[in-house]
């Protein structure tokens, strides 16, 4: 297959504003070190321009931009500034250490913004555009000017301001859909008409900046590129003001996957996209929605039996890109109530089981029954089903009864009765809290060296009568076993979950012994 040479005129500059517009998202504030870490990651993955912050906003923002400017190896480091000279001068000082720095200054141009926000006449705004860009150009050759709320600005006035900004020295013109109001066709046409109308439009690169208020930020961004823009302003995970910004990972992969319709290219290393998503999610404490395009937990996960069957036969049946291209190790066939026999058989083979047709049928029937009761069915659950079928028995350790004494004074005490292989054992133990006392009881009754890795509790439903669902994960000999249990009594649910994980460890150990016997015999 012949590869078409990349043309510079089809190159799209990726301008990441996660550290500025993204951090303006309520609750997404990052620490100084977190900003440096995110900036380093953006620099490494090939982002062309990093908008590192708004230096005039605070001393902390200034210091972050200044330090990022010092450390950047590849990216242009940009600072945001209002149209005032004080803002611009402060921004210039912040980006000074950068090998390549940019000042991004902006001013509102729409009637509603000029009247209510700026309380200025159009003539005053026009003069301020010239004044601010001129001031910025005195500090650096790389100046970006944004017409805030461009999509609601009168066209003739927008063109006048753009022409003046370019004449004053702006090298990039950004026309943002500030409130996410535009639709793709009109956004594309705006860029086409502006570039056609403004006489010196060829002297600057045009840029898109789209918000997601109507869910069209990515579509609008690509429409703007189709209209002649060659810079996209975006954020990791699409975080930003209100409903967010266009998501960098979606834009980059859209250009990569649909080269037939989007014949543009960029410098992003796509295998870092998932890592970037997780880094920003951790820094902002904003979880990524499971069904988020490209980087969501379910982006390459399949539960439907029909889909799993297709994926097993050929991944192209239900995936338009490979998970490896975005830094995911592989496709996940999620086992649940929608899974069919083909999916279960594939999972059993992955786990190393070789079962007869009758055994598979037995496991499948019990798997479907379990999937109807459980939201998530994990590998450990399937292993437990198989172990139960192969061992012709149920859990060897069962909870018979539990009594816990807890209060504000004195140690917490638990008394537990277990059925261990048909033998009743009773023990009492104390702990630093009732849950600790319960787990200490189990350790006394069934001595083991498994380590507790996870203990989580949440209410299954609302109200004071809600069942508590407890998850416990135990680590033993390099393998983790997870179990869940639900009960109106949180302590009973905790005991059941712990015992469930312990039973899986016992079953796994017995299975390992069975597998070792044929190997020894063969060696003999």
Swiss-Prot record:
- List the pathway annotation: Amino-acid biosynthesis; L-leucine biosynthesis; L-leucine from 3-methyl-2-oxobutanoate: step 1/4
**UniProt-recorded Gene Ontology molecular function terms:** 2-isopropylmalate synthase activity; acetyl-CoA C-acetyltransferase activity; manganese ion binding
Write down the required cofactor(s).
Mn(2+)
Query: Which cellular compartments is it found in?
Result: Cytoplasm
Q: Where is the signal peptide?
A: none
Function per UniProt: Catalyzes the condensation of the acetyl group of acetyl-CoA with 3-methyl-2-oxobutanoate (2-ketoisovalerate) to form 3-carboxy-3-hydroxy-4-methylpentanoate (2-isopropylmalate).
Name by which UniProt lists this protein = 2-isopropylmalate synthase
Taxonomically, what lineage is the organism? Bacteria, Pseudomonadati, Pseudomonadota, Alphaproteobacteria, Hyphomicrobiales
Which gene is transcribed and translated to give this protein?
leuA
